[in-house]
């Protein structure tokens, strides 16, 4: 089969998707890839006469079901076209199937996908190689929030509209949580940094070597509630492998669902690496546990993922080993930018670059 990667570009209102799509086409076409883009289906439907704010329940239901049907049909048709091309292909979806669920009650969503013969796991985990979520400008870059670039946008540029946009942003992230390659792209002081981050994440998916990038890490104490966080329990096991390579299995449980992911990191030089990950089934996961590194213990931790002022954080509370250790890690914050710490986080120590606190080393048997 041809080398085809299908990627969802999603996010809250006014997140920069339109500009990012243009940059993706220009950048990867220049590298020899054929790039297909699938337009945002709800916008097409709105322009065609669909009213997603209607009080007519039957009209709303049929409209949402048709939206999903057309989304999947466009993706499947584009995939068949891509298979006829003798060069590597990237299919970029301006939103994907799970975005539709963000606007529906769980009951209505399950009814629609049941009628169409799908499950949430199939639509979220099996159709796309990666999901890139661009954080809305309503969260951390309010000065750039506008509705002028999309006449179909329903969230106004006032404080009430900004709050609606922030909540929708969180709903979309929640809908995609569980995909093995979900990446949240922060807002940045310089919008170009946000776009470059998108290109970097897609390059990772394509297996293009990338510079080794150190995310900032801190030992912290949580002093208040974290509203709107996505909570999950993680079991992480490292496998035996060749020198210069790190292989891990991760079992992640959230909202009663379990996802298994296999990740490989291979260092090509002191400043360049390739990272690949794939979702696997329970049987393969349990089989591969037989290859567990005997010199390392399994890590168990509870994770809270959240956005604060346009920046994405992961807060890990370790259960074993190192019970009581709480580490806050930034995701995709540019080197020249400052970290916007939430008021409910007290930083005790900056451990960025401290190899003692790499998960791989925390797992070492004492």
Tell me what each language-model feature is.
Residues 9:
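Hydrophobic anchor at the beta1->P-loop junction of P-loop NTPases
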Residues 13:
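The conserved Walker
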Residues 65-125:
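Glycine-rich phosphate-binding loop used to anchor ATP phosphates in small-molecule kinases
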Residues 107-174:
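A glycine- and Lys/Arg-enriched "phosphate-lid" helix/loop adjacent to the NTP-binding pocket
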Residues 126, 184, 192-366:
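Phosphate-end processing signature that detects enzymes handling 5′-triphosphorylated RNA
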Residues 17:
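Conserved lysine of the Walker
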Residues 25-70:
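Conserved substrate/cofactor phosphate-moiety recognition/catalytic segment
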Residues 20:
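Hydrophobic positions on the alpha1 helix immediately C-terminal to the Walker A/P-loop
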